[in-house]
Design a protein with these regions (language model features):
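PLP-dependent aminotransferase class I/II
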Residues: 1-183
Length: 183
């Protein structure tokens, strides 16, 4: 059987009906993004003082759409791992992603087997053959994936201010009880 998880650059083309729906949805985009920004700012303000937790930084003149609300945990300062934090927040009803896949570590790159069994683009004569995707070439991304990154999928939910306030309370509850988590 041909592997289905080793295709680079899927070509997803939309039909007319999907495009019509998309055109209508785009009319709502600015309002949805502004609402999500306001909620993200509320969330960031509510949890930014928790020791060992970093909220997204947006430099002046830049914007963020908060597809994901990324957090960084310093386990040494927090006193617990990101996995323990995620598990405790899950018990409070807040679901966080604990990993953001490092693409260079996917089997497709490790084995250089894209596009079925052809090995393209690595098998092509115009491709450098000495390209390595070994663990360690992206140390910051790998550390984030292994130890520090947590992500809240803000675009997954139709959140209200009161929902965000509940999430903030859940974070504070977890931080108040993190000593118990590390036992």
């Amino acid at each position: 059987a041909m592997p289905i998880n080793n295709m680079l650059g899927y070509n997803f083309r939309l039909g007319e009906i999907e495009c019509a729906i998309g055109m209508e949805q785009l009319k709502k985009l600015n309002g949805l993004v502004e609402s999500r920004r306001a909620l993200a700012e509320r969330l960031a303000a509510g949890i930014c003082e928790l020791p060992g937790l970093s909220v997204p930084y947006v430099a002046d003149g830049n914007t963020h759409v908060y597809y994901v609300f990324p957090l960084l945990v310093d386990p040494d300062v927090a006193g617990v791992s990101k996995f323990e934090i995620a598990e405790a927040l899950k018990a409070e009803g807040v679901i966080l992603a604990t990993q953001y896949q490092n693409l260079h570590l996917l089997p497709m790159y490790q084995q250089k087997t894209a596009y079925g069994t052809s090995g393209f683009p690595w098998s092509a004569e115009f491709t450098r053959q000495d390209i390595s995707y070994e663990k360690g070439i992206c140390p910051v991304a790998e550390d984030m994936n292994d130890r520090t990154y947590l992500g809240f999928g803000m675009c997954t939910y139709d959140l209200t201010e009161s929902d965000v306030d509940l999430i903030i309370r859940a974070f504070h509850k977890v931080w108040a009880h993190k000593v118990e988590m590390s036992r």
